[in-house]
C-alpha cells in the first residue's frame, strides 16, 4: 500500500509539473528594426548617386534598388515616389578606394576595397529624427586579384553590406 501511495504521489506531482510548465512560456524575438511610429506610412528612396573619384557604373542603380527592396520586405512602409513621403532617403557613394593592407617583403599580399556612402535621411513628420551620416564597407581580398574580378565576384556582397548598414542607420536604435 505504501508503494502505491508513493507512486501515485510521483504521478500527481509529475502531472502537475507538466501541466504548470505547459502554460508557462517564454518568447524571445529579434527584429532588425525599432518600432516605426504608426503615423509613418510611406518612404521614398531617391537615386543614390556615385560621386566617388572612381565610378563603378553598376553600384548606384543596384544600391538604390536593393535598398528599396529591403525597406519594402522588412517594414510595413509603402513606397511613394512623391515629395510627400514620410521617410525620404537620399545620399551618394562618397568613396570607392583601393588600398594595400598586407605586405610580404616587397610584394602586396592583401588589398582592401573601401566603399563609403553618405546618407541623408529626412523624417518629414519629425525633424529631430533626421540623420546625415557616413557608412563605410571594407572588403579585404588577395592582392593577386584585379579590381574588375573583385567587382564581378563580390559586387553583390558589397551592395548587400552597404544596404544593411544604411538600413540599420535609418531603422535601428542600437
Question: How should these model regions be labeled?
Answer:
Residues 2-13:
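Bacterial N-terminal signal peptides that target proteins for export
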Residues 43, 89, 133:
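A broad, low-specificity signal marking well-ordered, structured residues that form hydrophobic/aromatic
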Amino acid at each position: 500500500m505504501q508503494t502505491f501511495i508513493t507512486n501515485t504521489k510521483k504521478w500527481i506531482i509529475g502531472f502537475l509539473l507538466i501541466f504548470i510548465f505547459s502554460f508557462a512560456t517564454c518568447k524571445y524575438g529579434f527584429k532588425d528594426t525599432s518600432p516605426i511610429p504608426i503615423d509613418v506610412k510611406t518612404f521614398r528612396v531617391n537615386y543614390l548617386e556615385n560621386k566617388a573619384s572612381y565610378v563603378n557604373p553598376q553600384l548606384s542603380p543596384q544600391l538604390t534598388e536593393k535598398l528599396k527592396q529591403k525597406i519594402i520586405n522588412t517594414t510595413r512602409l509603402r513606397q511613394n515616389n512623391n515629395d510627400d513621403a514620410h521617410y525620404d532617403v537620399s545620399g551618394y557613394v562618397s568613396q570607392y578606394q583601393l588600398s594595400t593592407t598586407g605586405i610580404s617583403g616587397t610584394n602586396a599580399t592583401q588589398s582592401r576595397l573601401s566603399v563609403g556612402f553618405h546618407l541623408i535621411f529626412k523624417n518629414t513628420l519629425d525633424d529631430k529624427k533626421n540623420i546625415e551620416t557616413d557608412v563605410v564597407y571594407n572588403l579585404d581580398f588577395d592582392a593577386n586579384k584585379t579590381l574588375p574580378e573583385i567587382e564581378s565576384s563580390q559586387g553583390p556582397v558589397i551592395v548587400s553590406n552597404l544596404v544593411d548598414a544604411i538600413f540599420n542607420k535609418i531603422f535601428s536604435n542600437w
